[in-house]
Amino acid sequence: MSINRNLLNIIIILCICLNLGCNDGAQERETDSHTIQVSSLLPSSSSSCVLSPRASTTKSSLHVTHRHGTCSRLNNGKATSPDHVEILRLDQARVNSIHSKLSKKLATDHVSESKSTDLPAKDGSTLGSGNYIVTVGLGTPKNDLSLIFDTGSDLTWTQCQPCVRTCYDQKEPIFNPSKSTSYYNVSCSSAACGSLSSATGNAGSCSASNCIYGIQYGDQSFSVGFLAKEKFTLTNSDVFDGVYFGCGENNQGLFTGVAGLLGLGRDKLSFPSQTATAYNKIFSYCLPSSASYTGHLTFGSAGISRSVKFTPISTITDGTSFYGLNIVAITVGGQKLPIPSTVFSTPGALIDSGTVITRLPPKAYAALRSSFKAKMSKYPTTSGVSILDTCFDLSGFKTVTIPKVAFSFSGGAVVELGSKGIFYVFKISQVCLAFAGNSDDSNAAIFGNVQQQTLEVVYDGAGGRVGFAPNGCS
């Protein structure tokens, strides 16, 4: 009888093993990693553009295109080859500028009050590589213009005729305010002109009683011109009269191709603040993982996924353009990294649409790099590039198994990164971990746009929170 009972126990155990898996290590490797085709890491060679269904069907939604992709109006259906080293250089310039602005180390000298073309003082505003673009209608009649959208900037601006000193090369016709019946300049005695200090870091000045703005970016790009009000058209049903924007008559720098910038920051002159009665300071986006696909930028709460998990906006960025986050943990391959809570809580963190590579405090990055390399030990390493020091040569492999990486934020939001949110690919023989360490423990962490790809990212300015959900572009 005991033999039969023992046999029965063995059978039960075998059944459990077959159904649930008795090899914990094997199960952990399967569920805590991505196995993908190496070729899928490369940019698509397709010359066609796949439109995001979200942007095509959701109210108040715009298509988001990659600056170098086939979907961009700027490229006439042909992808352009980005200079990755230059992108990373500009990215570091942006990060340096963000950190300087947060630590209040940059000078905030005023724009000279003599001429509208005077170069403003360096103010700590941020540009970077400006990877993602939307098309917005400006004026009456409407002029469709391609603008970089940026959660780290407040003032929306575009190049305007006449170019008093210089304008950079722009693919679309430069906006001519004299041909718009809805354009008018703003007085230098207005409250909006007085708000320029907080929106741009430079006080407004006067030219024949008209308000002059000036903004200079961390890479020495700049725009100077008239603060004005104009009609903005997002969609046929989303039209706003009297939106404050900068009409730049002296513009220079690395904006080449685009008309200007759409400011999505937190200041009262930002686009979300100016349209708050319509959208309640809510907008969301999904950044496409491929340059041959579009994502979306949607204003208001329409179409936001019920699966979005929110985290409170932290106080670290109060008084700035930025949206702060509280990172509480990072996991690699299902294992929580041994990072003391003070590593993140002391400098704080923020999310930024314009920073490419996620930056972490030195101790946090060291823990991430060490764990990731250990789990990728079967793949040969190769030399790093610029700010990226952990790279792999995958040229001898058809598939690659990548440990999953997830970020946990206060409030219970957990963001698991897709495979394209983990790597920055130069070529198959040089596939790099898309994270970098800050130069100092006091510098804030920045959740960059490589890690945001394909996520639905929701900014609820009125509710003081940021949310995340997977599969945001579909």
Curated annotation (Swiss-Prot):
<comment type="similarity">
    <text>Belongs to the peptidase A1 family.</text>
</comment>
<dbReference type="InterPro" id="IPR032799">
    <property type="entry name" value="TAXi_C"/>
</dbReference>
<feature type="domain" description="Peptidase A1">
    <location>
        <begin position="132"/>
        <end position="469"/>
    </location>
</feature>
<dbReference type="GO" id="GO:0098552">
    <property type="term" value="C:side of membrane"/>
</dbReference>
<dbReference type="GO" id="GO:0006508">
    <property type="term" value="P:proteolysis"/>
</dbReference>
<feature type="propeptide" description="Removed in mature form">
    <location>
        <begin position="444"/>
        <end position="474"/>
    </location>
</feature>
<feature type="disulfide bond">
    <location>
        <begin position="391"/>
        <end position="432"/>
    </location>
</feature>
<dbReference type="InterPro" id="IPR021109">
    <property type="entry name" value="Peptidase_aspartic_dom_sf"/>
</dbReference>
<dbReference type="InterPro" id="IPR032861">
    <property type="entry name" value="TAXi_N"/>
</dbReference>
<keyword id="KW-1015">Disulfide bond</keyword>
<keyword id="KW-0336">GPI-anchor</keyword>
<keyword id="KW-0472">Membrane</keyword>
<dbReference type="GO" id="GO:0005886">
    <property type="term" value="C:plasma membrane"/>
</dbReference>
<dbReference type="Pfam" id="PF14541">
    <property type="entry name" value="TAXi_C"/>
</dbReference>
<keyword id="KW-0732">Signal</keyword>
<feature type="active site">
    <location>
        <position position="352"/>
    </location>
</feature>
<feature type="signal peptide">
    <location>
        <begin position="1"/>
        <end position="25"/>
    </location>
</feature>
<keyword id="KW-0325">Glycoprotein</keyword>
<feature type="active site">
    <location>
        <position position="150"/>
    </location>
</feature>
<dbReference type="InterPro" id="IPR033121">
    <property type="entry name" value="PEPTIDASE_A1"/>
</dbReference>
<comment type="function">
    <text>Probably not redundant with AED1 and not involved in restriction of salicylic acid (SA) or systemic acquired resistance (SAR) signaling.</text>
</comment>
<keyword id="KW-0064">Aspartyl protease</keyword>
<dbReference type="Pfam" id="PF14543">
    <property type="entry name" value="TAXi_N"/>
</dbReference>
<keyword id="KW-1003">Cell membrane</keyword>
<protein>
    <recommendedName>
        <fullName>Aspartyl protease family protein At5g10770</fullName>
        <ecNumber>3.4.23.-</ecNumber>
    </recommendedName>
</protein>
<dbReference type="InterPro" id="IPR001461">
    <property type="entry name" value="Aspartic_peptidase_A1"/>
</dbReference>
<dbReference type="InterPro" id="IPR033873">
    <property type="entry name" value="CND41-like"/>
</dbReference>
<keyword id="KW-0378">Hydrolase</keyword>
<keyword id="KW-0449">Lipoprotein</keyword>
<dbReference type="GO" id="GO:0004190">
    <property type="term" value="F:aspartic-type endopeptidase activity"/>
</dbReference>
<keyword id="KW-0645">Protease</keyword>
<feature type="lipid moiety-binding region" description="GPI-anchor amidated asparagine">
    <location>
        <position position="443"/>
    </location>
</feature>
